[in-house]
Amino acid sequence: MTRRCDITGKSVLSGNNVSHANNKSRRRFLPNLQDSALQSDALGHSVKLRVTPRGLATIEQKGGLDAFLLDTPNRKLTDEARTLKRRVAKAAARREAKSA
């Protein structure tokens, strides 16, 4: 499982620990990933994603998972999010056709 946010795409960075004597040793900066189940209104069930707190805040700001996915261009989404976006769009179109 990759250490990458499914929404924002944030991943592991590398750098140095620098001591007071200016000795440098390599280290990794890991993203703060949280396993979360987000409710999708179009799909009718929750979807499990690995998301950073910043990604969760972005989803909430946009008005939920479905609104975030449909509003965000594909070039800004990760592969997992693009797959989920297609599923949400299909389910929303199916629901729209059913109500019409």
From Swiss-Prot:
A biological process from GO: translation
Entry keyword annotation includes Ribosomal protein: yes
InterPro entries registered for this protein in UniProt: Ribosomal_bL28 (IPR026569), Ribosomal_bL28/bL31-like_sf (IPR034704), Ribosomal_bL28_bact-type (IPR001383), Ribosomal_bL28_sf (IPR037147)
Listed Polar residues bias regions: 11-22
Family per similarity comment: Belongs to the bacterial ribosomal protein bL28 family.
Encoding gene (name): rpmB
Protein's name in the database: Large ribosomal subunit protein bL28
GO molecular function: structural constituent of ribosome
GO CC terms of this entry: ribonucleoprotein complex; ribosome
Keywords from the named record: Ribonucleoprotein, Ribosomal protein
